[in-house]
């Protein structure tokens, strides 16, 4: 999917500030451009545009999604080793480490801070253990829902 900015852009730079990969450039008060090679299709830019100037590949305005429509990260806790690669890669500080009761898991596991997650897939790409996936809440597979590990108090 490729997003684009149309001529109604007022150059407020809100999208530039929100883009985790610096894929958007432009002068203040001028038309901005999205570099498709850098864009990760996270959709973080659209909801902050005050003039609805960011369109998706179908020409639809990229607006704020309802909470249940928004894709977010889900951790497959049995596969998470606590390596923190996803935490380090997340541009929105949407992941944190939490301890677990199992003493063999001294590193802990990753927890998603849902309010910060945009579903940009950077964590999913960074995980070498296939322990993190991006889904809408209403489409999460049962095997992932049932993968909870007992966390330390």
Predicted ranges, named:
Residues 1-8, 16-17, 37-153:
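Flanking helices and flexible, charged tails adjoining ferredoxin-like Fe-S electron-transfer domains
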């Amino acid at each position: 999917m490729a997003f684009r900015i149309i001529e109604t852009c007022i150059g407020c730079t809100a999208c530039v500030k929100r883009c985790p990969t610096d894929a958007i450039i432009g002068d203040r008060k001028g038309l901005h451009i999205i570099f498709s090679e850098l864009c990760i299709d996270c959709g973080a830019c659209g909801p902050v545009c005050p003039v609805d100037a960011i369109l998706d590949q179908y020409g639809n305005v990229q607006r704020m999604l309802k909470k249940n429509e928004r894709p977010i990260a889900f951790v497959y806790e049995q596969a998470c080793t606590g390596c923190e690669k996803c935490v380090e890669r997340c541009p929105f500080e949407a992941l944190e480490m939490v301890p677990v009761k199992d003493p063999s898991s001294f590193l802990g596991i990753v927890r998603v801070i849902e309010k910060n997650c945009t579903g940009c897939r950077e964590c999913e790409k960074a995980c070498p253990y296939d322990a993190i996936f991006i889904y809408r809440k209403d489409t999460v597979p049962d095997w992932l829902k049932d993968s909870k590990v007992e966390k330390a108090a």
